């Protein structure tokens, strides 16, 4: 994952120090792009160990259209706890927008189901898009979408995905986002009868929080190991039928976890 370490180094050395909503302070750049060949391995960081269980369950939770943390907590995942209200609700965040975008006429649009249909029927379309950024719902969300808009592209029997992320917490969030959208691309490719292509990650405000500088330097001192591979149960042909047990990570040789505080 030299690609990720290059981002880390670029922001540390070339970024601009700014204030931010959380009050912590950041060093950031505006506009950065990474590309990962998904046939070369699963893009999960090896320079610090990541909690893959949280990544997989969060993605399945999004695909369920769920916006309450109860299901996540049932499966030992706490990454959304800081933002939930006393009943566990987060408002109309990712899952709701993906699966039940509210239309002005009262309908609810299942963007993911529409996407799957279009990939199969019109794979050359330039409208293979899902958006989580709904201006009408922002004030109702516990946290507005950071990874807000993604598009798929089919060529030579391969499925590629490009994500636009408006706000990119490089040390804590981005490693999760890379793995999550890489996995989503693999899942959609499988149920669509396609091979995987590239995952392209385009960042808007790419930032390191000021209390992550030391951890970032520590991570940059480590040498990346070979990427692992993700084995997905080939029997699953429906995107919404995937379970945690359908995924097996192979040859993940990661260095120790690096702890860092989260900015809420």
Swiss-Prot record:
Record SUPFAM superfamilies: Thymidylate synthase/dCMP hydroxymethylase (SSF55831)
Single biological process term from Gene Ontology: dTMP biosynthetic process
PROSITE patterns: THYMIDYLATE_SYNTHASE (PS00091)
Domain of life: Bacteria
Pathway: Pyrimidine metabolism; dTTP biosynthesis
Catalytic activity: dUMP + (6R)-5,10-methylene-5,6,7,8-tetrahydrofolate = 7,8-dihydrofolate + dTMP
Record-listed dUMP binding positions: 21, 126-127, 166-169, 177, 207-209
Binding site for (6R)-5,10-methylene-5,6,7,8-tetrahydrofolate: 51, 169, 263
First-level EC class: transferase
This protein's record includes keyword Transferase: yes
GO cellular component: cytosol
InterPro entries noted in UniProt: Thymidate_synth/dCMP_Mease, Thymidate_synth/dCMP_Mease_dom, Thymidate_synth/dCMP_Mease_sf, Thymidylate_synthase, Thymidylate_synthase_AS
Keywords associated with the record: Cytoplasm, Methyltransferase, Nucleotide biosynthesis, Transferase
This protein's record includes keyword Cytoplasm: yes
Entry's family note: Belongs to the thymidylate synthase family. Bacterial-type ThyA subfamily.
Protein purpose: Catalyzes the reductive methylation of 2'-deoxyuridine-5'-monophosphate (dUMP) to 2'-deoxythymidine-5'-monophosphate (dTMP) while utilizing 5,10-methylenetetrahydrofolate (mTHF) as the methyl donor and reductant in the reaction, yielding dihydrofolate (DHF) as a by-product. This enzymatic reaction provides an intracellular de novo source of dTMP, an essential precursor for DNA biosynthesis.
Protein's name in the database: Thymidylate synthase
Organism (species): Bartonella henselae (strain ATCC 49882 / DSM 28221 / CCUG 30454 / Houston 1)
Protein's gene: thyA
